[in-house]
Amino acid sequence: KINGVINIIGHAGSGTHLIIDNKVHAFSNKNAISILKNSQINVYHDENEKIIRIKKVSDKYDHKIISKIDLHLPINSNIRGEIKNSDLSISKLRGTFAIKSESTDSKLTNLSGDINFNTKGGNIIANKLSGSVQLNVISGDIDIFDCSSNTITNIENGNIIINSLQGKLISNTTLGETLISNIEGDLCEININVGSLKITNCKSDLNAKIDIGN
């Protein structure tokens, strides 16, 4: 599992560019070197299968290291991974995305394909996504705008704000508020256990169920 500030950006070329910047809290240079040796981030490149693997050796000293990772990939790339604690940004890519995180604030921008994002804690901002999108959050908010995708959202504790969505929407909330505006598609299905719902300018077949709330 990787943690830190992570930026993944697509580009028109065929090459891959990776920069890892580590800042260490230590009482001496010797201690800092020891911490870095035991917290290395290994990068594996399989040219035949066209796969790049980034894996951290140990998370023992995560509380003493602040990492910044910048990864530039070809536009047509698939991403699969697990992230511990981070600020994550993914943009300008086409492919399949399967991300699991523990505590992550994420920004997904200009992505196209099959997008599946799961986080235990943290907020998700999704902008200009297309394809098939599923966003699952245990505790946090989801903000979706200017997207053309078939979208499924699942939140246990948090709010959903959607503005300008073209495509089918299925939204499930255990506890929280749902605000939707400017949606157009075959179906808009909203399920809320406890919370409130406000919809404006909906051009979809609307099916809303609220157990407790309005």
Language-model segments: which ranges?
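Acidic (Asp/Glu) and glycine-rich low-complexity loops/linkers
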Residues: 3-119, 123-137, 143-154, 161-172, ...
